[in-house]
C-alpha cells in the first residue's frame, strides 16, 4: 500500500488528495477508496519509525562518511478549513497576505537533513522528521518539539554528530543539557542577556558561581569588539565579511554551557548586521556564518513541497490521518530527491529542459520540479511495460502524452 500510494502521489500531476493518489497509481478501479483512506486513518505504522529509516537512508547515501549531519529546523502552516480538522487552529503564518500574519490550519515542526549534491551549487534540505503542533497547556511547544525530533534523529543515527541550525524562535531553556553529540546554532536575539564565563573556584564555603558578570548589550559589544575579515560561501556566492567572536554564556537559554557568539557585518563600517550563537566551540566564525546561511534551504524545501510536491493537499480530518498525510507526502518528496541524486540525474537533463523551454537561458542546474517530472515520467513509462507485451491502449497513450505535456509546461 505504501509503495502504491507513493507512486500514485508522484504520478498524479493534479491535486494530490488521497483519492488522487489512488488514481495516479492506476488502482482506482481495483481498490476501494476506503482502503486508501484507512491506510492513513487506521493502518498500523509509525511516522517516527519511518522517519528513522529515512534519516539513515539519507545519511548513508548523501552524507560523506565521517561528516557531521547538518539538520535544519523550521515550522510551517498547512492551511485547512473546518472546526472538525484535528489540531487545526490559528497560528502565525509568515506567508499570509496582509499585515496580520496569521492563518488557520495545521502547524508542523519539520527537521530536515541538509546535504550538498554535486550538480547543485546550493545546499538542499530533505525533510525527515515531523511533529504536529497542538495548542493546549499540556502540549509541547515548538522548541520542545524540535528538541524531541533532534533527539530521535540522534538515536536513529547511533549518536552520530548532529549540527542543528534554526532561526531565533528556536532558543530557550529546553535546550539546556544537550548531549555532547548535538550542537545548536541560531540567531541571537538583540536583547539577549549574555554573561562572562564562570570564574575559577575561590576555595571559600558556599556554592561556586555559575556565571560571570553580565556583559554589555550587543550594540555596545560590537563597538568594543575587534572585527577580522573572513570569506564565506553562502547563498550560492562567495562573499567577504567581517566577524568578531565572543566566548561567553547565554545563561537564560543554555545555562552553564559555554557558547560562541559571532557578530557579522557585511557593509556597515560600525556596529553589526547579524549576531549568531552556537554551542559548537570547535567551528570557526566563517563556519558559523555558512552554517546559519544553510538554514535557508529548509525554507526553500518547504516552499517546493507545497508548490511542487502536493504536500498539504489531502483533506483528512481525523487524528491519525491528519498526523500521517503531511509526513507521508514530505517523505515522498525526500525519496524523490534521493532517487534523483543516486540514479536519476543525467548531465543532459538541463539541456533537455532548456530545449523544451528555451526562455530559460540561464538555467544551469536541475530544479526540484525537474526531479519530480523525471521520476513521474519513469513511473508512467513503467505502466506501459506489461509482462505480456501488448500494444498500448488509447488510455495509456493519453497518460503518457499528459506526462510529457507536464514536462513541457
Which residues does each PLM region occupy?
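Electropositive nucleic-acid engagement tracts
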Residues: 9, 13-83, 89-90, 151-152, ...
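Short amphipathic alpha-helical "interface-anchor" segments enriched in bulky aromatics
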Residues: 77, 285-316
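Active-site-proximal, Lys/Arg-enriched surface segment
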Residues: 41-123, 130, 233, 239, ...
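A short, flexible helix-boundary coil/loop motif
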Residues: 1, 9, 117-118, 122-135, ...
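Extended, non-catalytic structural segments that build the interaction scaffolds
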Residues: 2-9, 270-296
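Electropositive, glycine- and tryptophan-enriched low-complexity nucleic-acid-binding patches
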Residues: 29-38, 94-160, 252-275, 279
Amino acid at each position: 500500500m505504501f509503495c502504491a500510494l507513493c507512486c500514485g502521489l508522484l504520478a498524479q500531476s493534479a491535486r494530490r488528495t488521497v483519492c488522487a493518489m489512488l488514481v495516479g497509481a492506476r488502482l482506482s478501479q481495483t481498490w476501494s477508496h476506503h482502503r486508501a483512506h484507512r491506510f492513513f486513518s487506521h493502518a498500523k505504522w509509525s511516522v517516527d519509525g519511518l522517519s528513522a529509516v529515512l534519516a539513515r537512508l539519507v545519511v548513508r547515501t548523501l552524507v560523506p562518511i565521517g561528516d557531521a549531519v547538518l539538520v535544519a529546523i523550521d515550522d510551517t502552516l498547512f492551511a485547512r478549513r473546518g472546526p472538525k480538522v484535528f489540531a487545526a487552529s490559528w497560528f502565525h503564518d509568515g506567508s499570509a497576505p496582509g499585515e496580520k500574519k496569521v492563518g488557520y490550519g495545521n502547524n508542523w515542526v519539520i527537521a530536515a537533513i541538509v546535504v550538498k549534491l554535486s550538480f547543485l551549487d546550493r545546499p538542499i534540505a530533505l525533510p525527515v522528521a515531523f511533529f504536529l503542533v497542538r495548542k493546549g497547556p499540556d502540549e509541547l511547544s515548538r522548541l520542545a518539539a524540535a528538541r524531541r525530533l533532534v533527539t530521535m534523529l540522534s538515536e536513529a543515527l547511533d549518536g552520530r554528530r548532529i549540527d542543528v541550525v534554526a532561526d531565533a524562535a528556536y532558543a530557550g531553556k529546553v535546550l539546556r543539557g544537550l548531549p555532547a553529540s548535538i550542537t545548536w546554532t541560531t540567531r541571537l536575539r538583540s536583547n539577549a542577556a549574555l554573561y562572562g564565563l564562570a570564574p575559577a573556584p575561590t576555595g571559600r564555603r558556599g556554592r561556586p558561581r555559575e556565571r560571570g558578570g553580565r556583559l554589555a548589550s550587543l550594540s555596545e559589544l560590537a563597538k568594543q569588539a575587534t572585527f577580522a575579515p573572513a570569506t564565506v560561501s553562502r547563498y550560492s556566492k562567495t562573499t567577504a565579511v567581517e566577524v568578531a567572536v565572543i566566548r561567553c554564556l547565554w545563561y537564560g537559554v543554555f545555562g552553564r554551557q559555554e557558547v560562541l557568539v559571532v557578530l557579522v557585518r557585511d557593509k556597515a563600517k560600525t556596529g553589526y548586521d547579524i549576531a549568531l550563537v552556537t554551542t559548537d566551540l570547535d567551528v570557526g566564525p566563517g563556519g558559523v556564518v555558512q552554517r546559519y546561511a544553510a538554514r535557508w534551504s529548509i525554507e526553500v524545501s518547504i516552499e517546493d513541497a507545497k508548490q511542487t510536491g502536493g504536500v498539504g493537499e489531502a483533506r483528512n480530518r481525523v487524528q491519525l490521518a491528519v498526523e500521517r498525510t503531511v509526513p507521508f507526502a514530505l517523505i515522498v518528496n525526500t525519496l524523490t530527491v534521493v532517487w534523483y541524486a543516486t540514479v536519476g540525474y543525467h548531465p543532459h537533463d538541463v539541456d533537455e529542459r532548456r530545449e523544451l523551454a528555451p526562455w530559460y537561458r540561464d538555467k544551469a542546474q536541475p530544479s526540484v520540479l525537474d526531479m519530480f517530472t523525471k521520476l513521474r515520467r519513469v513511473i508512467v513509462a513503467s505502466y506501459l511495460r506489461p509482462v505480456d507485451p501488448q500494444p498500448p491502449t488509447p488510455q495509456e497513450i493519453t497518460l503518457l502524452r499528459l506526462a510529457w505535456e507536464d514536462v513541457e509546461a
